[in-house]
Amino acid sequence: SSADGKYTYQTFMDATDLEAATKIYAMGWERCAMVGGKPSGWESRFTNAQYFYNAITSGTLGGSGQGLAGATGSQLAVVNACKSTPSPGQNWCAAWVTNVFKAAGVGTFGGNACDMVKAWCHSNNPADLKVGMIVGDASHPGTGSPGLLYGHVGIYVGDGKVMSNEGAITTKSLDEFIAFYGKGSGVYWGWIGGVELK
């Protein structure tokens, strides 16, 4: 508790690293229960703290990532394929991503959303986000069992927007996408297959 002096305003202000500051905030203000030596919901809390810290310090909070005007070659081919590739159906977000990259001539990359995210998405720093990167989570509670088991994946199309298959093909702001899908394992991005688009 804050009474023992560990989780006070002053200890928060004196914190020199993000992990300590996040823990102090969770324990001192949100009054979270401790689970395994960390505040409850730690993975989601710390992932979101990293996202906002990176966004604030890089000056890209709100409408983050590379703009579409800066995209070239295969990046634009992926954006065009996003706009023309139909939905394979509800709960088939990763299949849509696979179909988009195949249609764009980049390659064929299979797996569930959680597989793609775990293999290729390792950043949540908005400064790293480029047009054509996949964006997703390995697990989230918002869509019930499918989301918890398989996560969700979409494609960053520039200007702070992510397209994905949610039954219909949707376009959301990165902030909206993170607000919904970031409540579990957190949202990360990277190049599918490790193939940097140029």
PLM features: residue spans?
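Acidic, low-complexity intrinsically disordered regions
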Residues: 25, 88, 92, 116, ...
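A generic structural signal for well-ordered alpha-helical surface patches
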Residues: 23-27, 47-50, 95, 133, ...
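...with weaker cross-activation on analogous glycine-rich loops/strands in unrelated enzymes
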Residues: 13, 107-177, 184-186
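Sec/Tat-exported extracytoplasmic proteins
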Residues: 1-4, 29-33, 53-60, 82-86, ...
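N-terminal capping segments
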Residues: 57-111, 118-119, 130, 145-152
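Aromatic- and glycine-rich peptidoglycan recognition patches
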Residues: 35, 54, 62-73, 79, ...
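Non-catalytic cell-wall polysaccharide-engagement segments
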Residues: 2-73, 183-198
